[in-house]
Amino acid sequence: MQISVNEFLTPRHIDVQVVSPTRAKITLEPLERGFGHTLGNALRRILLSSMPGCAVVEAEIDGVLHEYSAIEGVQEDVIEILLNLKGLAIKLHGRDEVTLTLSKKGSGVVTAADIQLDHDVEIVNPDHVIANLASNGALNMKLVVARGRGYEPADSRQSDEDESRSIGRLQLDSSFSPVRRIAYVVENARVEQRTNLDKLVIDLETNGTLDPEEAIRRAATILQQQLAAFVDLKGDSEPVVVEQEDEIDPILLRPVDDLELTVRSANCLKAENIYYIGDLIQRTEVELLKTPNLGKKSLTEIKDVLASRGLSLGMRLDNWPPASLKKDDKATA
């Protein structure tokens, strides 16, 4: 199979192998040599750092003033409880932040199912253990759940309002990403006689709030959106190209006097040897502002008059001035 050096193979086969409800293996092939690592590493970084999700960012526990406390009748200390709260897989439908409550007493296991939920809040892992209570134990707490992206340490959420925050409101370092683990390998692939191609295999596991296949789709969309700016890359000062036909637009051959500019503006243009509209539209704003006695007010007037005729400054004309105009100039001379 002969392929031009300017052409690249594009993946023609994608396979999704569902290992569990929260884990999947995605295979993409064939890829040009080296593109397996290029795409795999880019997607891996986006999945780990840029996927939005929800997490507990603050907890307030009755009888607890700081995270180094212990609660009577509770097997875990406060630090262990906070670590367990980080394992909650929560989905918010419609809101960016909510406050939830948990209240339980007596011997038994405290799980995510004991949290009192609002109508637009969902906990995907209700069996997740938060603490274990003895017969004389009780656990009452308020949890603030927020939507975010990536990893956010507690220090980054501190503000001037922290001084007025009541004692006992414990801030948590939060990992919002629904992706728990991702790894990729690049294997060999073959298409007809070409054996030096790549096959990308991504092994992805989430916390259940996001389907693995949907996570890959979102990561690819983010990457596509970020690279789109390079696809449409253009220079800031690129002149506008005027489509040329067999004959030049007659309006470009008319003298600038036909624009009915003020005497000041017209004299400034003639002083710069700008006699025809075709000469004028090829000048830029910067060039005109360098003209003696031509200020921003005159420049605005010129731009408005040209715009009324469908023209603008900074346009480019091929084969200007035309031969007929040169002959007229010589005859006048």
From Swiss-Prot:
This enzyme's EC code(s): 2.7.7.6
SMART domains per the UniProt record, alphabetical: RPOLD
Gene3D superfamilies: 5' to 3' exonuclease, C-terminal subdomain (1.10.150.20), DNA-directed RNA polymerase, insert domain (2.170.120.12), RNA polymerase, RBP11-like subunit (3.30.1360.10)
Matching SUPFAM superfamilies: C-terminal domain of RNA polymerase alpha subunit, Insert subdomain of RNA polymerase alpha subunit, RBP11-like subunits of RNA polymerase
Name under which the protein is recorded: DNA-directed RNA polymerase subunit alpha
GO biological process: DNA-templated transcription
Native source organism of the sequence: Pseudomonas fluorescens (strain ATCC BAA-477 / NRRL B-23932 / Pf-5)
Enzyme class: transferase
Keyword GTP-binding: no
Keyword Transferase attributed: yes
Free-text note on domains in this protein's UniProt record: The N-terminal domain is essential for RNAP assembly and basal transcription, whereas the C-terminal domain is involved in interaction with transcriptional regulators and with upstream promoter elements.
Source lineage: Bacteria, Pseudomonadati, Pseudomonadota, Gammaproteobacteria, Pseudomonadales
